[in-house]
């Protein structure tokens, strides 16, 4: 990020506590949980009966119903978040140089519900009943494709898929394209809709999910001694990234500056982090180096914080390794405590939360943290939000396959 400056000029988000950025932000500041018993299908035979879903979503606000019927819900969510972000940015399609504007929005899994329903259709009625829109309505890059068509974005058009790090990686890659001069404007982020029978069943089989069925709202409890797994959730987050001078020239509202991006690989295990979190530590170190910052410059970490036994302690250990004595002065909190794990969307949604924390100088809480687990002894902002003085904040995402990403944002003035 040492060449052209990259700023954030638009935000769009759907998550289990709100279908727009500001409504979700108000809920997160108040520490409200969006986790509930799932009702779209019968979960009685599953070990987990709950998750985080999008409530009262009206796709007709974003696109004609005939178009929506041709695509999986994860695409609908991603396009809705992209539309909110584009409108929020104040960009004018007619004034935008289309060859200098692009999109990088991904998903961790893709059109899972569409695939499930089409598989059932084949069993019931045979292959001739498959919709001609099945493939373009399910594949991972089609949020980017649809947003590109919608806004005539003729620049870079891509979609990074890296499990739970998807949103973060798409933002970082898009920022790099602006920084190195290949684009002036990029829409970037991630979307997911995996609270389906196969999605829930797959994560149950992996024993990754909490089974606190008697009290879903307290199930996501990062760093708590009684945590027992993550909560599967849906949503989308899209940011408008823009070259600084381009944004200033058109009088854009600037939320924050993206100053650092780091990546790493655990090279250890498909689903578990290495003891001590060395991959996560390297990722944060790379982000700091990219930003040209010292560990002491960071005041807040929006953690990956999934509420898993191994993941929470590994991230805590990694933070201690990177920040040393300064780790005791850091504020660290988990958005997932309130909205669960949005998989490929989580990094983008949490980046938005980090940006709004910088804007409002406020830390969102880690709810359900009643008794910290052994070795989890940082300031996790338990239970309630609080004011803070923030100049730089870091957001972490770590995914299956050992894929890691960290973003550093600076308060803009």
Regions inferred by a protein language model and the residue ranges of each:
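Glycine-/small-residue-rich "gating" segment that lines the acyl/pantetheine channel
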Residues: 124-131, 172, 176, 185, ...
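Active-site-adjacent elements of ketosynthase-type condensing enzymes
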Residues: 47-53, 110-114, 193-220, 262-282, ...
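Condensing-enzyme catalytic core mediating Claisen C-C bond formation in acyl metabolism
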Residues: 5-9, 36, 214-291, 300
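ACP-dependent fatty acid/polyketide chain-elongation machinery
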Residues: 1-67, 89, 245-257, 352-366, ...
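Phosphate/pyrophosphate-binding loops at sites that engage ATP/ADP/AMP, CoA/4′-phosphopantetheine
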Residues: 85-97, 247-254, 284-300, 322-326
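Active-site-proximal alpha-helical scaffold in enzymes
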Residues: 78-91, 140-144, 148-192, 230-252, ...
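Conserved beta-ketoacyl condensing-enzyme motif
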Residues: 8, 29-162, 191-202, 295-311
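Flexible, low-complexity linker/loop segments at domain and module junctions
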Residues: 1-8, 93-98, 291-297, 328, ...
């Amino acid at each position: 990020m040492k060449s052209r400056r990259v700023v954030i000029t638009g935000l769009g988000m759907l998550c289990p506590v709100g279908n727009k950025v500001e409504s979700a932000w108000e809920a997160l500041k108040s520490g409200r949980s969006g986790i509930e018993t799932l009702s779209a299908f019968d979960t009685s035979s599953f070990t987990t009966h709950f998750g985080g879903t999008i409530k009262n979503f009206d796709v007709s606000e974003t696109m004609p119903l005939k178009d929506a019927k041709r695509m999986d819900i994860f695409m609908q969510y991603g396009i809705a978040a992209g539309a909110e972000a584009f409108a929020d940015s104040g960009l004018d399609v007619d004034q935008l140089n289309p060859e200098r504007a692009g999109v990088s929005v991904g998903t961790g899994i893709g059109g899972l519900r569409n695939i499930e329903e089409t598989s059932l259709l084949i069993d019931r009625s045979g292959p001739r009943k498959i919709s001609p829109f099945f493939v373009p309505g399910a594949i991972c890059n089609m949020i980017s494709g649809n947003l590109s068509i919608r806004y005539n974005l003729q620049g870079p058009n891509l979609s990074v898929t890296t499990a739970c790090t998807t949103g973060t990686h798409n933002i970082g890659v898009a920022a790099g394209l602006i920084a190195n001069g290949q684009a002036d404007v990029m829409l970037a982020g991630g979307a997911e809709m995996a609270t389906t029978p196969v999605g829930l069943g797959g994560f149950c089989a992996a024993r990754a999910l909490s089974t606190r069925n008697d009290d879903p709202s307290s199930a996501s409890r990062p760093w708590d001694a009684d945590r027992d797994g993550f909560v599967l959730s849906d949503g989308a987050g899209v940011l408008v990234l823009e070259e600084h001078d381009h944004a200033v020239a058109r009088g854009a509202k600037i939320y924050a500056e993206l100053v650092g991006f780091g990546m790493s690989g655990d090279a250890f295990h498909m689903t578990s982090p290495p003891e001590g979190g060395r991959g996560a530590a390297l990722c944060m170190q790379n982000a700091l180096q990219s930003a040209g910052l010292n560990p002491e410059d960071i005041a807040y970490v929006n953690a990956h914080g999934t509420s898993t036994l191994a993941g929470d302690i590994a991230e805590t250990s990694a933070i201690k390794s990177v920040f040393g004595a300064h780790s005791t002065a850091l504020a660290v909190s988990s958005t997932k405590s309130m909205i669960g794990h949005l998989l490929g969307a989580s990094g983008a949604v949490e980046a938005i939360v980090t940006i709004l924390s910088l804007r409002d100088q406020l830390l969102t809480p880690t709810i359900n943290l009643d008794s910290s687990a052994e070795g989890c002894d940082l300031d996790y902002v338990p239970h309630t939000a609080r004011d803070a003085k923030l100049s730089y904040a870091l957001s972490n995402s770590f995914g299956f396959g050992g894929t890691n990403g960290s973003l550093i944002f600076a308060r803009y003035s």
